[in-house]
Amino acid sequence: MHQSLLCFGARRLPMTTKLGHQYYKGTRTGKMGQKTRHGGFLVQWSRVRTFVPPSGDCELLPFVSRRIQATKGTYPEGANGLDGAVYFDLAHS
């Protein structure tokens, strides 16, 4: 038995750039150039965002203190390596 067509239209999923016939959501990035006749893309460098770092000595500091020691993550392994039971135990601990 086939599902009703109403059920297909009633799904409530977030709209992505891949969904919707003849609907373009986009990613708010803007157009950085134009397509050429032969399928290429011509970049207009005046529209490209550039970030200029400070020149010379800069006294900007990182957000994390330099006194913090870097730690490497360790994961417990079960009898079968990192299986679903290990992840389940990690989530509920």
Curated annotation (Swiss-Prot):
Record's GO cellular component terms: mitochondrial large ribosomal subunit
One GO BP annotation of this record: translation
Location in the cell: Mitochondrion
GO molecular function: structural constituent of ribosome
Similarity-based family: Belongs to the mitochondrion-specific ribosomal protein mL41 family.
Quaternary state and interactors: Component of the mitochondrial large ribosomal subunit (mt-LSU). Mature yeast 74S mitochondrial ribosomes consist of a small (37S) and a large (54S) subunit. The 37S small subunit contains a 15S ribosomal RNA (15S mt-rRNA) and at least 32 different proteins. The 54S large subunit contains a 21S rRNA (21S mt-rRNA) and at least 45 different proteins.
Protein name, UniProt field: Large ribosomal subunit protein mL41
Source organism of the structure: Schizosaccharomyces pombe (strain 972 / ATCC 24843) (Fission yeast)
